Amino acid sequence: MRYIRLCIISLLATLPLAVHASPQPLEQIKQSESQLSGRVGMIEMDLASGRTLTAWRADERFPMMSTFKVVLCGAVLARVDAGDEQLERKIHYRQQDLVDYSPVSEKHLADGMTVGELCAAAITMSDNSAANLLLATVGGPAGLTAFLRQIGDNVTRLDRWETELNEALPGDARDTTTPASMAATLRKLLTSQRLSARSQRQLLQWMVDDRVAGPLIRSVLPAGWFIADKTGAAERGARGIVALLGPNNKAERIVVIYLRDTPASMAERNQQIAGIGAALIEHWQR
């Protein structure tokens, strides 16, 4: 009898961790939704197994914004692997091909850019004209959506080009994904045989080299942690990030966070995403 009581006491002693530790990131997300007066979608997924660790509105649609550029470059790399494209191929373009926010491509009107350089510009600097030039090589928005269907993503869709795809109208399914679908697609691109090992390394390196994500999860990342990410921003308060991160400089988990329909400023949106990232990391370290 005494042995049974000791077993029960030991079991009860473990319950507070099981009950109180897990919801902590979700509590942060609920607070963020309240403070933003908007919606948050999030998923934390184990990279190796694909198991969902934390989720909130993970199956609701959110604007992709510039996070689609990771998938776009994944589609480009798939064409490279198939022998239909070369990262060294030079693409020339004109002034009329440039759209708003093209910090890299606008400097190369005279000499053009290679496909690889365009992917680097699209991911590391979120260059919109670079994205459009690449999008043309995969068949436009319809071609990228077809690629998504081919790799098993039946949810994510791209319907328009930069910069119209950032309209983010309430209830509009165009140019949207769900946190769960985006995480699963990113995992396929980086771990399955959809891309060669070389192309997987290249896609990941472009994300590691992201130069416009500083105020988000990177701002709360502990020393020695790995991060590779791509951010996005759009009208009507939309903001987002797709990221791989983990301790010991190793990618272990995928984190996708999307915001929409909030009147908050960009700085406030960045702060809330950083707060959610910090909560996930703190929970991870327990």
Swiss-Prot record:
Record-listed substrate binding positions: K230, T231, G232
EC number: 3.5.2.6
InterPro entries per UniProt: Beta-lactam/transpept-like, Beta-lactam_cat, Beta-lactam_class-A, Beta-lactam_class-A_AS
Keywords: Antibiotic resistance, Disulfide bond, Hydrolase, Plasmid, Signal
Similarity comment: family membership: Belongs to the class-A beta-lactamase family.
NCBIfam families: bla_class_A (NF033103), SHV (NF000285), SHV_LEN_OKP (NF012143)
Role, per record: Broad spectrum beta-lactamase which hydrolyzes penicillins, as well as cephalosporins except cephamycins. Also hydrolyzes aztreonam, but not imipenem. Confers highly resistance to ceftazidime, cefotaxime, aztreonam and piperacillin.
The name this protein goes by in its record: Beta-lactamase SHV-13
The organism of origin for this protein: Klebsiella pneumoniae
